[in-house]
Amino acid sequence: MPELAVRTEFDYSSEIYKDAYSRINAIVIEGEQEAYSNYLQMAELLPEDKEELTRLAKMENRHKKGFQACGNNLQVNPDMPYAQEFFAGLHGNFQHAFSEGKVVTCLLIQALIIEAFAIAAYNIYIPVADDFARKITEGVVKDEYTHLNYGEEWLKANFATAKEELEQANKENLPLVWKMLNQVQGDAKVLGMEKEALVEDFMISYGEALSNIGFSTREIMRMSSYGLAGV
């Protein structure tokens, strides 16, 4: 991950900062809401893991409340319609997969892609966050690694039967991540978050997850290439 110095020149009360923050804050709130709903739906597909998935969902709901408090602390109203549109692609793909009972695709979208995206965003945000948001985000990111681990472990245990669907789901959903990164880069930069750092941190987390599941380095490079044209 590119080394980031803590920057102190931010005026967290400026209109420029608060305008960008209204969208970034909304994105993280909506991301946690998506995660909450997704884990509850996955509990329907994996009744044997219902207790664990419900626990993960409750954690995501707590995260959402924490990020709502971050917005309140800066007196910013999150632009939730913007955030809902931001997640529309992944949301639609998850709901389609859920309706067809495709648990592998659901796990890839939520437990790998969305979690790795969140980890990247939070890691890059922490050094440049205001003091209140930094404390909240540091606590959240620790939880997200455990959520990523849940998806890894389930998919690793079922790798032989899940591999083909994982490759197809990656092909369909990874390009959406690059579209999302491109869409958010202007606002992220105002907050001190560089797109290149977000991309690198995401690929580290996502690539490590794919490796832990059972994909070879060559396979991971091929799977990662589906998004490179959009970076």
From Swiss-Prot:
Record-level Gene Ontology MF annotations: aldehyde oxygenase (deformylating) activity; transition metal ion binding
Coiled coil: none
Chain residues that bind Fe cation 2: E60, E115, H147
Residues noted as binding Fe cation 1 in the record, renumbered to the chain: E32, E60, H63
Keyword Lyase: yes
InterPro entries the UniProt entry points to: Ald_deCOase, Ferritin-like, Ferritin-like_SF
Its biological purpose: Catalyzes the decarbonylation of fatty aldehydes to alkanes. Requires the presence of ferredoxin, ferredoxin reductase and NADPH for in vitro decarbonylase activity. Involved in the biosynthesis of alkanes, mainly heptadecane and pentadecane.
NCBIfam families named in the record: Ald_deCOase (TIGR04059)
Protein known as: Aldehyde decarbonylase
